[in-house]
């Protein structure tokens, strides 16, 4: 996978964390992940299709998910299994991926990427495999805790 595919997702994540959640963000380096990804405990997955196929992971630990959900809703939560925490994570993933895909489509006329609905998985150490697809990650350090952005893309015909 070309490492430049992750850039719009990182830019969108940094912007949303700063503007919407009022969190300071420091971005790490892009790293090749290969075909396996291990969850920190709370993972939002959003696929995309069109001229390219792929998926976006927004991954964080449970405490980070609780902090972010509280920032979004103004409520406090005791477990990341609460429905509002799951919905907040899904919505945050939707906003970030929507901004990233809009940026990609605007810079690649005719690509016409579209998003799938988000899914949220919980459980520390879950390993997810990309069949015949490698991915790249960037670790963001936020005031709420570390958040990993992971993107896998297979380019097709425009």
Region locations from a protein language model:
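N-terminal auxiliary interaction/assembly segments of multi-subunit proteins
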Residues: 1-158
């Amino acid at each position: 996978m070309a490492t430049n595919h992750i850039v719009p997702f990182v830019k969108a994540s940094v912007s949303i964390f700063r503007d919407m959640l009022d969190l300071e963000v420091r971005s790490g380096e892009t790293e090749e992940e290969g075909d396996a990804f291990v969850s920190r405990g709370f993972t939002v997955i959003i696929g995309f299709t069109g001229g390219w196929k792929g998926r976006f992971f927004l991954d964080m630990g449970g405490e980070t998910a609780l902090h972010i959900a509280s920032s979004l809703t103004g409520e406090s939560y005791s477990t990341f299994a609460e429905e509002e925490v799951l919905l907040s994570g899904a919505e945050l993933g939707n906003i970030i991926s929507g901004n990233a895909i809009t940026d990609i489509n605007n810079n690649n006329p005719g690509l016409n990427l579209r998003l799938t609905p988000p899914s949220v998985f919980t459980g520390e150490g879950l390993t997810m495999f990309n069949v015949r697809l490698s991915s790249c990650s960037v670790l963001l350090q936020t005031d709420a805790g570390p958040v990993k952005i992971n993107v896998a893309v297979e380019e097709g015909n425009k």
